Amino acid sequence: MKKRVWILTAALLLAACTSDEQSTKDVETEQSTDVVTIENEGITIVSEQAPTRAITVNQHATEVMLALGLEDSMVGTAYLDDAIYEPLQEAYNQVPVLSETSPSKEQIIETEADFIYGGWASFFNEKKFGSREELQALEIDTYVQSSSMKIAPTVEDVYTDIRNIAKIFRIEQRGEQLISQINEDIDTVTAKIPNTEKPLDVLVFDSGETEVYTAAQSFLNTLITMVGAKNVFGDMEDTWVIVSKEDAVERSPEVIVITDYGSTTAEEKIRFLKNDPALSQTPAVQNERFVVIPLTAASEGVRIAEALEILATGFYPEAF
């Protein structure tokens, strides 16, 4: 199944590029006459022409750009959480990597960027490369993934971001093609999910030693629900929360989803859970039911079908 999702995505990219080559004149006409105005998290973006020197910060934003075939419009990227999505690797290799973490304001200016697309609003501040207002004063438009700012974001929220980026770059048709393909891939995965009398109780383990940092009403909660399971902390009014080990044990998770990113490996997290006096008492640990998911796949980007497949395969191995 995973290979099928990858093949379909790669085929879409090839088709999108071919389609754009055939309609270059139409795109150029649209770019020269249309002014795009988008409201984005308190900032009004007024784009008189498609950006040609874009920078992405945060991997799920980078992968949206690459899935739309916009690598030639990029002058830099920064901050990977995990391995780049396989069908996008070749396109990613064509983009200069400015930093493994956050690029500096000086790096941004040196690239002569005209657009910055960030996955998280937290990167737009004085400690990193400047506020959105400051960058706007430098004639650098910015866009923050709105779906990453919401409590309980939906797949449609992600599609709104994809449509907005496609609109800014004047490639609306390509954006709709990508959304259509993601929907097809989602249907391919969810069609195999069995009906169950009781949803599996799932705990997300991101990190923590004395407490547990876990998903509440984040996009990962949305994904878990889409495959027919229940996030045991999905009733909390936030995206990610810190809870006590005792509370996690009391909710008796049957499966633990491990977010995989950064310097602490998934194997190390699983080892910690097995050795922890409290968390090792959960049914999930005692039955060694762990599902590892790359953080970017669980984020508000283009890897929704891959994320659903990973979760469903771990939850219902007999069906996959």
Q: Where are the language model's segments positioned?
A:
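Bacterial Sec-exported substrate-binding components of ABC uptake systems
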Residues: K2-R4, C17-E63, K167-V204, G314-F320
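A short, structured surface patch at a secondary-structure boundary
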Residues: T56-T111, F115, W120-F123, V232
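Short helix-initiation/N-cap motifs at beta->coil->alpha
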Residues: N40-G42, V95-E106, M236-K245
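Proline-aspartate-enriched helix->loop->beta-strand connector
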Residues: K105-G118, S244-Y261
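Structured C-terminal subdomain patch of bacterial secreted/periplasmic proteins
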Residues: P153-K167, E176, V255-F320
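Extracytoplasmic ligand-binding site segments that recognize negatively charged/polar headgroups
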Residues: W120-G130, I140-N164, L203-F219
